[in-house]
Curated annotation (Swiss-Prot):
Record's function text: ATP-dependent serine protease that mediates the selective degradation of mutant and abnormal proteins as well as certain short-lived regulatory proteins. Required for cellular homeostasis and for survival from DNA damage and developmental changes induced by stress. Degrades polypeptides processively to yield small peptide fragments that are 5 to 10 amino acids long. Binds to DNA in a double-stranded, site-specific manner.
Protein name stated in the entry: Lon protease 4
Domain Lon proteolytic: 595-776
UniProt lineage: Bacteria, Pseudomonadati, Myxococcota, Polyangia, Polyangiales
Stored SUPFAM superfamilies: P-loop containing nucleoside triphosphate hydrolases, PUA domain-like, Ribosomal protein S5 domain 2-like
Species this chain originates from: Sorangium cellulosum (strain So ce56) (Polyangium cellulosum (strain So ce56))
Catalyzed reactions: Hydrolysis of proteins in presence of ATP
Conditions for induction: By heat shock.
NCBIfam families: lon (TIGR00763)
Keywords: ATP-binding, Cytoplasm, Hydrolase, Nucleotide-binding, Protease, Serine protease, Stress response
Gene: lon4
Length: 799
């Protein structure tokens, strides 16, 4: 059995082995280390204080279960000084004794055991070793205070042999594991002393350099700026290293992102300037985060990234047909627009604007176009935006400034050629902070948006490849310059048959899925869907229809959840069952009841939520020929009433009106739903008809509605919104519609199935209106005319 330097016997092979992840135990030194690996803990449970074990360094500190090839060849026999339990494992104190050469690992469970032999050192020239040790001792006394180590204490107190003294000095230097292993593996004493002397000289030089750097930094910066000092130290170190390599820090990562962003020349120059500013300020500076956020926005924008665009028009048409019922003219115009984009390869075409009431599919059309063409789709909601900075961004001088919604949309899209939908453009407001609608003029102008400048970025960004789409409910709310930049595609609404088809193919499956109802558990008949459309909704779109179907599904889901046997019952909803699920009928066709007396006529109006019918009521009473007009009417509508009355008075004889009574009676014209503002010229024909009916005691036909502007000479002028108005008449159960002759061309836009159920009567003058709208025989005792109420809460109407 071999003897160790301490006089103890070397352990027999195989002996317990403790691998160290980092660091080296030198002979003659004491090491305290935490122990937590299961096999290392098992070793500590098997030994006691005073036992001798082997300690060896790992080549790879990340290796959890090292094998022979993962361990160095030279280790140290160590005496266990103390073992104590701590919160996260054990703490071991060991003392290095002698080197050993590792031969093999013979056991790995439950702990490591190894075979090895004592590795004796070779003294060589004893006098040379003594002189080298003395020199090393003096040098250690000098270097110790500079390096902040206990080298001076070791030099003063150690009486070890030259080889062990070299080990003690090497252990105190705090060297990397690789350099410590170079010393441990050197079995010749003289070369070991020489190697340690060189390492001590390097440590001294590094200490001098650090002192110089600290001095340079302190001369430039005041006391207490800890973070700035650390940063300046790093810069000074990099300066002394003259180009040394370093890992990628935050600044380097930001520089790399800017390099990869493909910035144009002007943006690149600004980014480089801001990068230099960022380098010159410390993280504690208020400007640091401002500059960094600005550079991150520049790096995140798609300056050159483009989506691969699919230009298959058949695919676009198929997608539109799949997701939208009807709207044939709308789809055709969309395809024409996409064809121009395909042929020119540019998005610098007129901006499409989908105009129509809520729920007709304006927003979803944009999504369908994006899906079919492969472009990312981004929606910007503009409803209620009153600040121009919401679109253009805030200038960086403001605290918390950020880019506007246009730049946000491009960042979200990650490409410079997305489809951007500007939703509810007509809901834009204006305030003392500027007009956001005016800011849209540059965005939507193909000649100007190539150099769009956001206030925050203050850099030109090319928007010419972006396909902008807009949606509005009321075109009249747009300014003339903005309206001029848009190509309007009107979506007037759906017919009852189209609504039923949409409900069957889209709304019902969607609600069944959302309510976790098996399609086989619920069946809604076509008659029930038709009744929902007729009796529970009165809209141009299908949004309310979707809510009613959702309500029905909730009621059915309750029945299924309450099923006693746990099996889902099959529910078939008939039209007669709707009262149980949806409550009382909400809408009735009361046109006949309202027009059953003279003096009441049915008109047609356009509102931002679609077409609607309105009633013009007139009454007369003893008086002095005065006229009262009520119903919250606008100036244009009041003038239409006066013009209609003037025509009646001037043609009283041919209309069968007693002129004497006109001077002795007051007239009252009222449009119900007085809480709703109304305006527009198209109620002129309806007011004339109501007045003529009142004064001639002839009822207006209950199945007839009308629209048109009248002149003092009795001409009927064209008006707008014909398709929406006719669809509203059809929804209300009207069978005959009187329209201006010059609106005959607009009848082509009305769906064929609606035209087949309506009689459209085109007129040029008032005499034709009277012939088409009034009954032949007068009624007895015309009285004071019919006055009935109207449903409140309807949207503002343009008559």
């Amino acid at each position: 059995m071999s003897q160790l330097r301490s006089g103890a016997s070397a352990p027999r092979s195989p002996f317990p082995l403790l691998p160290l992840r980092t660091g080296v135990l030198f002979p003659g030194t004491v090491l305290t280390l935490p122990v937590g690996r299961p096999r290392s803990v098992a070793l500590l449970n098997a030994v006691h204080a005073g036992d001798v074990i082997g300690v060896i360094a790992q080549r790879d500190p990340k290796r959890e279960d090292p094998r022979r090839e993962d361990l160095h060849d030279i280790g140290t026999f160590a005496r266990v000084v103390d073992i104590s339990r701590v919160s996260n494992g054990y703490r071991l104190v060991i003392e290095g004794l002698d080197r050993f050469a590792l031969s093999a690992l013979v056991e790995t469970e439950p702990t490591w055991r190894a075979e090895g032999t004592l590795a004796p050192e070779f003294l060589g020239d004893a006098e040379e070793a003594r002189l080298l040790a003395a020199s090393l001792r003096e040098r250690a006394r000098e270097v110790g205070p500079k390096t902040g180590t206990n080298l001076a204490e070791i030099a003063a107190t150690s009486r070890a042999e030259p080889g062990v003294f070299a080990d003690q000095v090497a252990g105190a230097l705090g060297l990397p594991t690789e350099k410590e292993m170079e010393v441990l593996s050197e079995l010749r004493v003289v070369p070991r002393l020489q190697r340690v002397a060189g390492l001590l000289a390097e440590a001294s030089a590094l200490a001098d350099l650090k002192k110089k750097i600290d001095g340079d930094v302190r001369r430039e910066l005041g006391k207490g700026q800890r973070e700035v000092i650390l940063r300046e130290q790093l810069r000074a170190i990099q300066k002394e290293l003259a180009g040394g390599e370093e890992g990628e820090d935050e600044l380097s990562a930001l520089r790399r992102r800017l390099d990869e962003a493909g910035l144009p020349e002007e943006a690149r120059a600004v980014a480089d300037r801001e990068l230099r500013r960022l380098e010159s300020v410390g993280p504690q500076s208020a400007e640091h985060n401002v500059i960094r956020t600005y550079l991150e926005w520049i790096a995140d924008l798609p300056w050159s990234a483009r989506a691969e665009v699919k230009d298959d028009l058949d695919a676009v048409k198929a997608k539109l047909d799949e997701e939208h019922r009807g709207l044939d003219d709308v789809k055709r115009r969309i395809l024409e627009h996409m064809a121009v984009l395909k042929l020119t390869g540019k998005a610098r075409a007129t901006i499409l604007c989908f105009a129509g009431p809520p729920g007709v599919g304006k927003t979803s059309l944009g999504q369908s176009i994006a899906d079919a063409t492969g472009r990312p789709f981004v929606r910007i909601s503009l409803g209620g935006v009153h600040d121009e900075a919401e679109l253009r961004g805030h200038r960086r001088t403001y605290v918390g400034a950020l880019p506007g919604r246009i730049v946000h949309a491009l960042k979200k899209a990650k490409v410079k050629n997305p489809i951007v939908l500007l939703d509810e453009v007509d809901k834009l407001g204006a305030g003392w902070r500027g007009s956001p609608e005016a800011a849209l003029l540059e965005v939507l102008d193909p000649e100007q948006n190539r150099t769009f400048v956001d206030h925050y970025l203050e850099l030109p960004f090319d928007l010419s490849e972006v396909v902008f789409l807009c949606t509005v409910n009321d075109l009249g709310a747009l300014s003339a310059p903005l309206r001029d930049r848009l190509e309007v595609i009107e979506l007037s609404g759906y017919t009852p048959d189209e609504k039923i088809a949409i409900a069957r193919s889209h709304l019902v499956p969607k609600q069944l899925k959302e309510h976790a109802i098996d399609p086989g558990s619920l069946s809604i008949t076509d008659e029930a869907l038709a009744a929902i459309v007729r009796d529970y909704t009165r809209e141009a779109g299908v949004r309310q229809l979707g809510r009613e179907i959702k309500k029905l599904c909730r009621a059915v889901a309750l029945e299924i959840a309450r099923a006693a046997d746990g099996k889902a019952p099959r529910v078939v909803v008939e039209a007669s069952d709707l009262g149980t699920y949806l409550g009382k009928v909400r809408f009735f066709s009361d046109v006949a009841e309202r027009t059953s007396v003279a003096g009441v006529a049915t008109g047609l109006a356009w509102t931002p939520v679609g077409g609607d019918i309105l009633f013009i009521e007139t009454s007369r009473m003893p008086g002095k020929g005065r006229v009262e007009i009520t119903g919250q009417l606008g100036d244009v509508m009041k003038e239409s009433a006066k013009a209609a009355l003037t025509y009646v008075r001037s043609h009283a004889i041919e209309l069968g009106v007693d002129t004497a009574k006109l001077e002795a009676e007051d007239l009252h014209i009222h449009v119900p739903a007085g809480g709703v503002p109304k305006d527009g010229p198209s109620a002129g024909v309806t007011m004339f008809t109501a007045l003529t009916s009142l004064l001639s005691a002839r009822r207006v036909r209950s199945d007839t509605a009308m629209t048109g502007e009248c002149t003092l000479r009795g001409r009927v002028l064209p008006v707008g919104g014909i398709k929406s108005k006719v669809l509203a008449a059809h929804r209300a159960g009207i069978k005959r519609v009187v329209l201006p002759q010059k609106n005959a061309r607009d009848a082509e836009e009305i769906p064929k199935e609606v035209r087949a159920e309506l009689e459209l009567i085109f007129v040029e003058d008032m005499s034709q209106v009277i012939a088409a709208a009034l009954e032949e025989a007068p009624i007895e005792a015309a009285g004071t005319g019919g006055v009935t109420g109207a449903a409140a809460g309807e949207p503002a109407a343009a008559a």
